Amino acid sequence: MRDQTRFEYTPTPEREFDLPNGANVAVWVIPNVEHYKIDQPSTAIYPPGTEYTPDVLNYGWRDYGVRAGIWRLMDILDAHEVPGTVALNAEVCDHYPEIIDAGLERGWEFMGHGTTNAQPHVDLDEAEERELIRATRERIEAATGDPPRGWLGPELAETFQTPDLLADEGFKYVCDWCNDDQPYPLHVREGELLSMPYSIEINDIPMFLTYGLTASQFEQAIVDQFDVLYEEGKEPGNAKVMAIALHPFLTGLPFRSKYLDSALSYITNHDDVWVTTGAEIASHYAESYPTSPSV
């Protein structure tokens, strides 16, 4: 057994964190755009189907996201001038290049999300994992023109060496830890790496598939989360970061998408809100709160 050694315990009241132009809260929206294998089980609306090969029912349900759902989400984010930070399986670049092109036209950010959602980073030695991380970085850079700065592990899974390898490969932030409302530095062997606030609560997979919430309840959860963070962020030095994690095969469905539209309308009609991308938050932190490289 071991204790974690990646970060220090720093209580919120002991920190100082501000945002550009005195914003109370930074809001970033993360569409997860993923590629699945037809012969491997994954996220399912009908779990018994995962025993079938091919699992046409669940594969088709997920495939709705890249065929229809993502385009509906793009329209909604466009309407509110909200940039997306896409958590991107690298294989999307080969299978659905039109999504990459549309995101680039909008100025969206693309962060690494592994090569495919069929391969979480578990039970890998360092060389194997480095190869996967590097392949993800290189494929996304080739498709978008920029190396990805952020990382979200498939299924938010890591090995004990993942943060070290991410820093080695030039990544600036990682979203797997989900344990804070503010960014903070991680200890890595060389360089620097931030833990960026992500959410497994304001996230449509657990909300709909685990908790069984309706779309209107998800909207209310987004609004409630925002309201509390917005009020807390009014205190000088106590600004917050709010993540909204989306999957196009869930929130991209018509009966759910209108509630996302309403939630984003509510957020963007507030003053002192910075609606931005993960890379912009990471850049602001690095410039405003420089840390010594980890040893």
Where do the language-model regions lie?
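A conserved mid-domain beta-alpha-beta active-site/ligand-binding segment of alpha/beta enzyme cores
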Residues: P197-E231
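Catalytic alpha-helical scaffold of carbohydrate-active enzymes acting on polysaccharides/glycoconjugates
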Residues: R2-L194, E219-I244, L250-V295
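Short, glycine/charged-rich beta-strand-loop motifs at protein surfaces that mediate ligand recognition
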Residues: L209-G212, F249-L253
